Amino acid sequence: MINGIDHYNLRSDEKMIETLKDFYISIVGLKLGDRPPFKSKGYWLYAKEKDVLHLSTSKDNIKNLINVNSTLDHVSFSASNKKNVMETLEKNNIFFKERYIPEINIEQLFFKDPAGN
């Protein structure tokens, strides 16, 4: 029985992985945490006590293909202070879109990371 999503992984070359690590820590607010000693270089980023984002270098440190057809549209994080998130995005010149879904009383912010995810 599936209980939910455990984590997601972004894979790219070492330079982009470093850029993504910095973005998800400084902008999104995830924390760097423990990661098993895999052969590939990478990081596990945590929300509270849970690893939610894995970053890993691709085989032979080659940047993954861009513009590959995919059905993945977005990944969603929950946050406790929308105003602070918006201020951080604005301060760092990160374009975002707001959306409110009144039927379920949800406010959303959509933005892209440096790799375009």
Predicted ranges, named:
Residues 20-27, 89, 116:
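Conserved active-site tyrosine of GNAT-family acetyltransferases
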Residues 68-89:
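Mid-chain, well-packed structural core segment of small domains
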Residues 31-66:
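Conserved short beta-strand elements that form part of the metal-binding/catalytic scaffold
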Residues 11, 46, 76-80:
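Short hydrophobic/aromatic beta-strand micro-patches
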Residues 1-3, 87-117:
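Vicinal oxygen chelate
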